[in-house]
Amino acid sequence: YLLSMTPSAITTSDAGAGIGYTTLRVRGTDGTRINVTANGIPINDAESHNVFWVNLPDFASSVKDMQIQRGAGTSTNGAGAFGASINMQTGDFSLKPYAELNGSYGSFNTHKETVKAGTGLINDHWSFDARLSNISSDGYIDRASVGLNSYYLQGGYYSDNTSIKLITFG
């Protein structure tokens, strides 16, 4: 539901709470015609070209910027950018160590807990960040509960002319 207020975008959710199996349509085209990338790397399924957002629970907590280009556009992985192109950029490294604990609660026993931590810049070149999340909801519809856990790990080497970043999430 992060994109639900975007002009010409429609989002739906099976459970009715915006968590779990959700779909996105832009300018009337379904998800198979929307090219979605994270840091320029395709997120779309290789076979159906759809994006299964349920496999990216709380990925938005690690996104610093998102660009949406509505309509036909260039595609990085085939001819799927007829409806739109969405590029998500993950956060940069932090110069100082940090730790965050976030929690939220809403209707239908919907709650989210997130723990984030980062080392800051180590020896002026290395940085590591991590996030753990839990999202749960009873859902608006009977027997439509959701329980999702996710992680995000990022490590990188940074210098004046070089930036190498390794990211894994699930």
Predicted feature descriptions by range:
Residues L3-P42, K64:
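Extracytoplasmic beta-strand/coil segments of soluble accessory domains associated
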Residues S13, G73-N77, N102-Y105, Y140-R143:
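Outer-membrane beta-barrel domain signature
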Residues T23, W53, D65, S85, ...:
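Membrane-embedded beta-strand positions in outer-membrane beta-barrel channels/transporters
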Residues P42-R70, Q89:
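Short acidic/polar hinge/loop motifs at secondary-structure boundaries
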Residues S48-H49, I68-R70, P97-E100, N134-D138, ...:
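Extracytoplasmic loops and strand-loop junctions of Gram-negative outer membrane beta-barrel proteins
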Residues V63-I68, A84, T90-Y105, F128-L132:
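Transmembrane beta-strand segments of Gram-negative outer membrane beta-barrel proteins
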Residues N77, F93-Y98, I122-W126, N161:
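Short loop/turn motifs that connect adjacent beta-strands in outer-membrane beta-barrel proteins
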Residues Y105-S136, I141-G170:
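Transmembrane beta-barrel wall of Gram-negative outer-membrane proteins
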